[in-house]
């Protein structure tokens, strides 16, 4: 699996995501750069994740981040197509100190740019800009699509140690149902694809923990499932096997982790979260689905 390039870069590795050109900044902590972490942006509404870094690649942390979007392949690439305010994602985990998310809709394919104005406290505002591409269609299940009715391994086929790399293992309720079984129930479903022990972005464990906390509040009204990215995590933890991606991950055509999907009671994708999504952000979408 390919971890979110922006986080790998923020932690000292990685070269950026395909089609993305990082802001060229001098190696100065007083400057700023931004990186787009999403690998599957397409026409229509999207949740976008950005790494907000100083000039030497360290996370700037919680800041007021305002974004402007430009369609560089459009008739007038200088026209601002939309403006949004980004949301800081790092209050719950140190691994997400660089990360901010926003909701934005794209009306054309091709090359786009995002410009960030970053202000922390009373300090001087910093600006940074980067480019990314928008596809016609998402490669992975998108909002409005029917969720794949995957028949994944569960506690009926395997002990929990083979179903998750989380140690100690967490709530067994996350491993009792297949996705197909959960979709047959008349209630929503949250599916977390993550590998807590082997995540390149260091946010898979916190992502699963966020879902487990939400299950304590909403587990009587909806289903929760965790899909470990790799087969036999018990043997991977002791270096006895090479990593093999689970069939469920291939079913959903995922290329990054963590990836979280919220499915409504009709079996359609109501929301999706590439990369880390804190519990409060997930909860907003859950509340909307439960109220619909």
What function would you assign to each model-found segment?
Residues 159-162, 171, 179-200:
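Short active-site neighborhood of thiol/selenol oxidoreductases, capturing the structured segment around
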Residues 219, 229-257, 262-269, 287-291:
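Thioredoxin-like thiol-disulfide oxidoreductase module
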Residues 194, 226-228:
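Residue-level recognition of beta-strand->loop/alpha-helix junctions
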Residues 18-163:
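Contiguous segments within soluble domain cores/interaction surfaces
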Residues 140-141, 148-159, 269-292:
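Thiol-/selenol-based redox modules, centered on thioredoxin-like
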Residues 12-15:
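Bacterial signal peptide processing site
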Residues 7-10:
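C-terminal motif of bacterial Sec signal peptides marking the signal peptidase cleavage site
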Residues 201-218:
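Typically the conserved alpha-helix immediately C-terminal to a functionally engaged Cys/Sec
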């Amino acid at each position: 699996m390919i971890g979110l390039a922006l986080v790998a870069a923020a932690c000292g590795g990685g070269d950026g995501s395909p089609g993305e050109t990082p802001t060229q900044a001098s190696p100065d902590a007083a400057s700023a750069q931004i990186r787009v972490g999403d690998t599957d942006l397409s026409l229509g509404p999207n949740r976008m994740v950005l790494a907000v870094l100083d000039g030497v690649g360290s996370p700037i942390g919680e800041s007021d981040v305002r974004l402007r979007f430009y369609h560089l392949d459009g008739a007038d690439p200088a026209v601002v197509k939309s403006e949004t305010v980004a949301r800081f994602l790092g209050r719950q985990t140190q691994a997400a100190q660089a990360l901010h998310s926003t909701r934005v809709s794209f009306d054309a394919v091709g090359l786009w740019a995002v410009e960030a104005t970053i202000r922390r406290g009373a300090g001087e505002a910093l600006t940074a800009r980067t480019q990314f591409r928008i596809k016609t269609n998402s490669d992975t299940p998108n909002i409005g699509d029917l969720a794949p009715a995957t028949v994944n391994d569960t506690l009926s086929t395997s002990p929990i140690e083979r179903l998750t790399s989380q140690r100690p293992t967490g709530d067994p309720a996350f491993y009792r149902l297949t996705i197909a079984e959960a979709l047959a129930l008349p209630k929503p479903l949250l599916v977390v694809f993550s590998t807590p022990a082997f995540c390149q972005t260091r946010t898979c464990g916190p992502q699963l923990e966020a879902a487990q906390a939400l299950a304590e509040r909403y587990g009587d009204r909806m289903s929760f499932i965790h899909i470990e990215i790799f087969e036999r995590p018990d043997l991977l933890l002791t270096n006895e096997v090479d990593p093999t991606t689970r069939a469920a991950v291939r079913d959903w055509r995922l290329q990054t982790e963590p990836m979280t999907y919220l499915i409504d009671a009709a079996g359609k994708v109501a929301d999706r979260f590439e990369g880390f999504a804190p519990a409060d952000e997930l909860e907003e979408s859950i509340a909307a689905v439960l109220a619909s």
